[in-house]
A protein has these predicted regions:
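Serine-esterase "nucleophile elbow" of acetyl-processing enzymes
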Residues: 1-39, 44, 50-59, 64, ...
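Soluble non-cytosolic domains of exported or imported proteins
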Residues: 16-19, 101-113, 157-164, 208-213
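Oxyanion-hole/transition-state-stabilizing segment in secreted/luminal serine hydrolases
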Residues: 15-18, 45-112, 139
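Solvent-exposed loop/turn segments at secondary-structure junctions
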Residues: 8-12, 38-43, 69-75, 137-141, ...
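Catalytic His-Asp segment of secreted/periplasmic serine-dependent ester chemistry enzymes
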Residues: 136-213
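Helix C-cap/helix->beta junction micro-motif
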Residues: 29, 125-127, 177
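Structural recognition of the beta-strand scaffold that forms the well-ordered cores
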Residues: 2-6, 32-37, 62-68, 130-135, ...
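Generic structural signal for well-ordered alpha-helices
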Residues: 50, 115-119, 167
């Protein structure tokens, strides 16, 4: 049993159930997918999805996949810092000395702080479960209404960051929290910035989400 947390690419309601990526994993690997992704969700929403997973299944599952972050970029969430630092007094070889100590930033006001909150919480809530992150894929343009028009990824977002900065932060979190990451940004082969890549997206007003292919 594998839990899938994330956004619209994971959400059951976006594609037919048998054409989601987790449905293909079910077919190929004979897993039981436990799907909690919700369209529009960001890293800050993952704790709520995880709590619902626990309410529904307790510890009766084997792994957690987290596929989220593209909406954080679109929402212009600042990248932020991983740690704060302060000088503390600590015992080192029987001598009290002053050293600089770093503490993870734990709040949802920045991207890195939000990742810290999520991974810290999941490792406490499910200490014996395998946790795997997946980076967002490349982003083409999308228009879902007059007030929801999303430019291509070659534009900076509202806080002056490119999508790459969010991808890099997820990969940094992999090392900081000892959580494997599947770099779909590099490995998926999907590049919806090109019209020739239309075979992989719905097309029209949506070059953001992958299709069943």
């Amino acid at each position: 049993k594998v839990a899938f947390l994330g956004d619209s690419i994971t959400d059951k309601g976006v594609l037919k159930d048998d054409t989601h990526y987790w449905a293909y994993l079910d077919q190929w690997l004979d897993i039981t997918p436990l799907v909690y992704g919700i369209s529009g969700h960001k890293w800050e929403h993952i704790p709520g999805q995880a709590q619902k997973l626990r309410n529904d299944h307790g510890d009766d599952f084997d792994a957690i996949m987290i596929f989220v972050g593209t909406n954080d970029y679109n929402a212009a969430l600042p990248i932020g810092e991983w740690f704060t630092e302060e000088v503390v007094t600590v015992n080192a070889d029987g001598v009290m000395v002053q050293r600089v100590r770093r503490t993870p930033v734990m709040d949802h006001s920045t991207f890195r702080g939000s990742i810290n909150v999520v991974l810290d919480g999941l490792k406490r809530m499910f200490p014996d479960k395998q946790i795997v992150m997946m980076t967002p894929i490349h982003r083409g343009a999308a228009s879902f209404g007059e007030d929801n028009v999303q430019p291509t990824e070659d534009h900076q977002n509202g806080c002056g960051e490119y999508l790459d900065a969010y991808i890099d932060s997820i990969k940094e979190a992999s090392a900081l929290w000892s959580v494997p990451v599947i770099d779909l940004y590099s490995l998926s082969g999907i590049y919806p910035m090109h019209e020739e890549q239309a075979i992989y997206v719905p097309g029209g007003t949506d070059w953001l989400h992958p299709n069943e292919k």
